[in-house]
Each structure stands twice: as C-alpha cells, then as structure tokens.
Amino acid sequence: MKVKWETYNPDWIIQIAKEQIPEETEIIQNLKHCIKCFKRSKAYYYFVYSENPNEPNSEWQFDENIILHSKEKGEIVLDILLDKKIGGIEFLNKL
C-alpha cells in the first residue's frame, strides 16, 4: 500500500484525553508523537503504517480501543497498539 503521510496536529485530542482518561498517562504521552498521518478516509487516520496488521514483524499490533467524546467531532475511537502506541483514530460521525 502506497501511503501519503501528512502533517498532523494532535493538540486537540491530547486535551480531550487529558480530560477523559487522565489515568492513561502513557497513551496521552504517545498522542504527542502523532504528528504525521495517512488519511485513509474522512473517518479514519493512521499514525502507524498498517500493512500486514497483527502479523510477525508488522508495526501494527492491535491491543485495544478507547472511545473519547468531542463536542465538535462526536465519538472518536483510538486504536491502541500493544506498546500503547496510537495506531489510528476513527471519527464515528463521519462513517
């Protein structure tokens, strides 16, 4: 899959995470590293290359989802990988 990475500003989602999941300090810290993204669609942005997900040697090793709520953007799903890295973000109101 050929991807085009774009600059991304995660400040807005960091603020929401600090308010809604303050106990998840590692996830909040890792959101700060989400400064480039690949927009698969209006509803989903990747922060980690996702080819061959969950296969050996793939960077994408899924662990869990965390759902956050934004007044402006609605429900947001964070894809959290095994090392608490942020794999991607999904905007449910854009599906």
Model-derived regions: residue spans:
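N-terminal domain-onset segments
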Residues: 1-63, 73
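Short, compact, well-ordered microdomains
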Residues: 61-95
